[in-house]
Regions:
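Ligand-binding pockets and gating/stacking loops
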Residues: 1-185
């Protein structure tokens, strides 16, 4: 668009004052930047997906029962890594479960939901289970970060170096619904 009209623009600029030329330059720069972004987006749509290794394909091609929380979490994290690796997306969100319905983790002996455990009332058994639950969740997140570090992007660099990741909770102290000083990594 800009190139097709550049001669006409240059003729107009000869009649403009300094301030108007500055505004015109800002406008033309904005148009050029929009053209570049549009061209880049069009090119991206036609870019074939890269090949993935058989080990990555097997890692993400499995039926996972939510009762096996570790397998479930790692599968979702693997899918996120694969999406970043192949540049299918640059944004992903994963909730381990809502504050009110995060599921039990029977594989480590936790039959209560996280929400139920957070209302521990000072019960040491519940508090220990809550600690174990959170430890388990952060171990799964650590798995995700490790996968980002060991997986290369399209330029051959670790994905972790070009990824911003946030892990946290909407409650700092669930027993009283405290939401100040939220625990975030």
């Amino acid at each position: 668009v800009l190139d097709d009209n550049l001669d006409e623009v240059r003729q107009m600029e000869k009649k403009m004052g300094t301030a108007d030329k500055g505004r015109m330059d800002q406008y033309l720069t904005s148009v050029r930047e929009a053209e570049i972004r549009t061209r880049r987006a069009d090119d991206w749509l036609d870019t074939p997906l890269p090949q993935i290794s058989d080990s990555d394909r097997k890692r993400t091609n499995r039926k996972v029962n939510k009762a096996q929380a570790g397998d479930y979490f790692r599968t979702v994290y693997d899918l996120m890594v694969l999406a970043f690796q192949t540049d299918v997306t640059r944004v992903a969100t994963f909730s381990l479960g809502g504050e009110g319905d995060a599921f039990a983790i029977p594989e480590i002996g936790i039959t209560e939901s996280r929400h139920q455990l957070s209302h521990h009332g000072g019960d040491e058994g519940y508090m220990e289970k809550l600690t174990n639950y959170d430890t388990f969740a952060i171990e799964q997140y650590s798995y995700f970060l490790s996968r980002l570090e060991e997986t290369k992007d399209l330029n051959g660099k670790p994905l972790l170096g070009s990824t911003m990741s946030l892990f946290g909770s909407g409650m700092s102290y669930g027993h009283s619904h405290g939401n100040a000083n939220l625990p975030l990594v």
